Amino acid sequence: MVQLGLMFRQKAPLKVILDSNALFVPFQFKIDLISELDNLLERRYELILLSPVKQELEALASKGSLKMRKAASCALKLAEKCRQVELKVPETTLVDDAIIEAAKDFRAMVFTNDRQLRRRLRDISVPVIYLRQKSRLAIDGLV
């Protein structure tokens, strides 16, 4: 009887690490990020924002063109709904490298549209969520 209870235990939520460009998707392509992720993943998930990604968004919100500053500010507001994870990384570490290390450590998926980062993640068998045909989200890899 105990074994039956184990079979029906809920799975832990999927961890999804967000790259900065993933947070721009709702504003650039008018896509409801949360409902698209709900439809795509079909189970509980937890959005994770790493401190280097947040710092990158804050830098974009304070510098650059008016359009970029506005988009970055909106992305930061959306990022408030995510679990914030503080990483202790050297200043010289690239954001992409921090994302890759965190994905390995947390055994998490990554949501990014960066082709180079997607390729690097797929090379180490990390599932990647990305925007397909500017209209919907897709997964590359096994969840």
Regions found by a protein language model. Name each.
Residues V53-V143:
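Nuclease catalytic cores that cleave nucleic-acid phosphodiester bonds
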Residues M1-R83:
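Domain-level signal for Mg2+-assisted phosphodiester chemistry and nucleotide/NA-binding surfaces
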